[in-house]
């Protein structure tokens, strides 16, 4: 085994991620650690809190050797689409093994469950439960008679194995036992959840940045907030990246989610039900309820009106991303059938340099501007959506000077020595 793939989002990178990479380095010291990372948008159906360029740099500083971007079509997809796209990229890049966080380290149990996911009886029960109004995850949990699927990441782990069985039978799996609760909202230890960190950065960072820009000076409240943020980040982020991340927050180079939500809400108001119907996941007449809810005072209020067991908040978020990025049902279907059309290099270190010289099933892109010339029609669509995702994310940054478009075209893969 020469290479291990890690499918990740690093939204943001923290001690839990460093723990996984460190564990792999100890267990497989001579093996390259290649991360397939969500880019400007993540599976929650919204922009990542930091740019993919910052997150890729931090990942290498935190123990990864190579960072490859997962195209936005997959990174904003359902668990099945996300997992399938990532695993097919792992195969296209000839990566030997796949490591992922899991609520159980019992690999045989996970493989056994994954094998039953596509059985006719399981699929029949799944359809029945979904027709009763259950979410995809809940319906699968009941159809498979297992409680392992009680978190989003547990479902993703099974989707990786499911995709591997279908597209990459020789792929090895290395589950790493999780050390934090996926949705824990408080910073209770040195291994926090991504949710807790995003909330910390958003609340404390908003106060400090807004205070600086509005007054030109730091208020006592702002100083306290900034100090608390710095202290808490330093206890939850690897020392190699803590000061860098704090500087990025201080510069306002992170997402203001209110700006993004207003963008989705505005698009929802100007798009007719007939137009909504062409975008991913708009089925069963929900486009009419969506248009009606768009008259609410905010995107948050609109989702509260639409939300149901079947249409969870996460699913509605993804639908909002499809609308914002112009991702249609046809594009999603083609992406599921054909798989990733390229692998975009974001960052690497000395250990990863040799690997970059190899040839793979899909183009390894280092120069974004030249890429469309060597891509298929679907690849060009993916390229356009990735560019748009970065541009939309940039528009949502706190600092106006960081809202410049087409950053993808000026970015060079980072060589971290």
Predicted regions and their residues:
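Active-site cores that bind ATP or allylic diphosphates and position pyrophosphate for catalysis
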Residues: 70-417
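Acidic, Ser/Thr-rich peripheral helices and adjacent loops at domain boundaries
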Residues: 54-57, 353
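Non-catalytic positions within long, well-ordered alpha-helices that form the structural scaffold/packing
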Residues: 26, 60, 90-91
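N-terminal catalytic cores of NTP/NDP-binding nucleotidyl/phosphoryl-transfer enzymes
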Residues: 1-55
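A glycine-rich helix N-cap at a beta->alpha junction
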Residues: 61-71
């Amino acid at each position: 085994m020469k290479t291990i793939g890690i499918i990740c989002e690093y939204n943001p990178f923290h001690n839990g991620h460093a723990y996984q990479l460190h564990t792999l380095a100890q267990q497989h010291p001579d093996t390259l650690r290649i991360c397939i990372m969500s880019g400007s948008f993540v599976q929650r159906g919204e922009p990542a809190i930091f740019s993919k360029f910052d997150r890729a740099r931090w990942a290498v500083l935190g123990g990864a050797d190579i960072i490859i971007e997962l195209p936005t079509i997959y990174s904003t997809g359902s668990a099945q689409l996300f997992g399938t796209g990532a695993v097919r990229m792992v195969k296209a890049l000839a990566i030997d093994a796949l490591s992922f966080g899991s609520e159980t380290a019992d690999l045989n149990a996970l493989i056994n469950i994954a094998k039953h996911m596509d059985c006719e009886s399981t699929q029949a029960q799944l359809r029945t439960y979904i027709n009763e109004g259950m979410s995809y995850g809940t319906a699968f949990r009941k159809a498979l008679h297992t409680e392992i699927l009680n978190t989003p990441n547990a479902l993703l782990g099974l989707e990786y194995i499911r995709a591997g069985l279908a597209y990459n039978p020789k792929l090895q799996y290395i589950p790493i036992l999780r050390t934090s609760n996926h949705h824990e909202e408080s910073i209770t230890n040195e291994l926090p959840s991504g949710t807790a960190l995003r909330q910390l950065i958003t609340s404390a960072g908003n106060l400090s940045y807004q205070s600086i820009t509005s007054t030109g000076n730091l208020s006592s409240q702002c100083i306290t907030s900034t100090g608390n943020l710095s202290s808490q980040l330093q206890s939850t982020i690897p020392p190699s990246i803590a000061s860098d991340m704090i500087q990025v927050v201080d510069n306002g180079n992170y997402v203001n989610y209110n700006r993004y939500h207003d963008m989705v809400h505005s698009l929802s108001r100007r798009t007719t039900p007939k137009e909504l119907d062409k975008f991913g996941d708009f089925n069963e007449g929900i486009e009419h309820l969506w248009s009606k809810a768009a008259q609410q005072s905010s995107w948050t209020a609109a989702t509260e009106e639409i939300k149901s067991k079947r249409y969870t908040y996460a699913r509605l978020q993804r639908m909002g991303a499809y609308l914002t990025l112009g991702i249609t049902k046809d594009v999603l279907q083609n992406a599921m059938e054909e798989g990733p059309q390229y692998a975009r290099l974001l960052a690497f270190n000395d250990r990863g340099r040799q690997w970059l010289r190899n040839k793979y099933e899909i183009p390894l892109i280092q120069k974004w501007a030249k890429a469309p010339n060597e891509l298929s029609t679907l690849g060009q669509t993916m390229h356009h959506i990735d560019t748009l995702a970065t541009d939309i994310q940039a528009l949502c940054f706190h600092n106006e000077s960081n809202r410049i478009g087409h950053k993808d075209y000026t970015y060079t893969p980072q060589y971290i020595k």
